[in-house]
Amino acid sequence: MMQEKLQKLFKEINLEEELFSYFNNATLDKVVVYDNNKQIDFILNTESVLPIEVYNNTLYKLISYFNAIENIRLIIKPSNIDNGLLSSYYFDI
């Protein structure tokens, strides 16, 4: 089950509910707001690496919602590493 505050964030940014399953047992570790509201880091703990499409979609929704902020970063800290999924991050660029 997804952490309640993470679920609230996803609903607020209108993340598609069909993507919620990728965040089962995920937690919002912390939100770091930098000086002058120029950057926010969302740091999530997940069970595994997210598919690149899910990561990009989530980041896009965060950027769209927090459009007054210059730089939004989504940092994922997976407990299990899948090298196959990681390689898709490099080939998608």
Regions found by a protein language model. Name each.
Residues 1-93:
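Intrinsically disordered, low-complexity basic tails and flexible linkers associated
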